[in-house]
């Protein structure tokens, strides 16, 4: 979890899965990434999969005009937290996955490929994240480890609440998607479970769209 503000929420979530593993993690701090790895090593000894679902950009970088909200600090923060953190975590966790048919997964969004109003710098970060997936797949492939991404349609989450006019984005998708609706967290989760499983053993370096056909 990121900080004390999220502790109760994450603890409750862990209990739903009968887990007592709740680890503080600021992905901008390499020491905390290493500490997370050591906790998991002590607890499990090995790892079959990992899901990266982390993204952040300062508010001024995800509203209004792209250039007006642009700054070196905001740009760097978005890339660090939303993109670099995935390969950084995979590198730290790799010793726990070597010798196993493991799989790593991240979450992205269409704003990496198309201009989405107010998504701005986060779209650039997601593009970097998707490129990282392809390079990870090439690096991990000889070890039998797969790397993929899920590009989900917009879902009401804590992170999404920071995007200006997010509700308009939801309604836009509902009106144009072939299924005439948004997707659910369960639908994204089901796809993640598939990609992490042996049923997806031939899939790596890919970006799977779960967006009601949008």
How would you describe each model-predicted region?
Residues 55-94, 98-142, 154-156, 175, ...:
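Catalytic loop of short-chain dehydrogenase/reductase
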Residues 167-187:
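Catalytic Tyr-x(3-8)-Lys segment
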Residues 147, 151-162:
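Short, flexible catalytic-loop segment of classical short-chain dehydrogenase/reductase
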Residues 141, 146, 203-205:
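Short, small/polar-rich loop/turn modules that mediate ligand/substrate recognition or access, typified
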Residues 1-73, 77, 90, 97, 133-134, 162, ...:
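Short-chain dehydrogenase/reductase
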Residues 45, 181-210:
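C-terminal substrate-recognition "lid" of short-chain dehydrogenase/reductases
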